[in-house]
Amino acid sequence: MSPGNTTVVTTTVRNATPSLALDAGTIERFLAHSHRRRYPTRTDVFRPGDPAGTLYYVISGSVSIIAEEDDDRELVLGYFGSGEFVGEMGLFIESDTREVILRTRTQCELAEISYERLQQLFQTSLSPDAPKILYAIGVQLSKRLLDTTRKASRLAFLDVTDRIVRTLHDLAKEPEAMSHPQGTQLRVSRQELARLVGCSREMAGRVLKKLQADGLLHARGKTVVLYGTR
């Protein structure tokens, strides 16, 4: 990602739903047929124009899905973590190339399997697991649709301060959030917060200062303690 890129309206990180109700045996059998790869932080796994033929499963770490405009602006469509599928639309809608960026947010281990190979396995060794895997993917797609609808409503009806407050409360429910004697401790930069709510970095900083003055949180550097959220 070039340093000059700017990021606009985004969805927030959602609660990861580990395995999406898939049992350990199903996951183990799925992973046995997949290729595991490790990626460093902030690595583009694929970009627009790359061949679209692979389903990804996040074993560990966190990734983002990003739409990129011609002027290098970026729209973060979502953050996804351990136990979630990425690139699942290709199982149902045929497309030759990718239209978005898959970028790691942390060090990640991903399981990768081609759509063609997975469809073959659904007819053979993964036949008993196929309904469970497809149902889990359907649940995931439904959650993402609901999340997108909720975020669109926030952008339409809430001001920046309200969006930041709600986003911080969303982040407080994430596995990365840490318990704190006064509430919940988050690690989020002003830039990342701006990307999550669709405002400038400067605006995000001003809102955090206001919320701190109002006694709702304490912010220092990338650390935010959100009071009363344990």
Curated annotation (Swiss-Prot):
Keyword Transcription regulation: yes
Location(s) in or outside the cell: Cytoplasm
Activity-regulation annotation: Allosterically inhibited by cyclic di-GMP (c-di-GMP), which binds to Clp and abolishes its ability to bind its target gene promoter.
Keywords of the record: Activator, Allosteric enzyme, c-di-GMP, Cytoplasm, DNA-binding, Repressor, Transcription, Transcription regulation, Virulence
SMART domains in the cross-refs: cNMP (SM00100), HTH_CRP (SM00419)
Any GO molecular function: protein dimerization activity
Chief location: cytoplasm
GO biological process annotation, one example: regulation of DNA-templated transcription
NCBIfam families on file: PRK11753.1
Protein name: CRP-like protein Clp
Origin species: Xanthomonas euvesicatoria pv. vesicatoria (strain 85-10) (Xanthomonas campestris pv. vesicatoria)
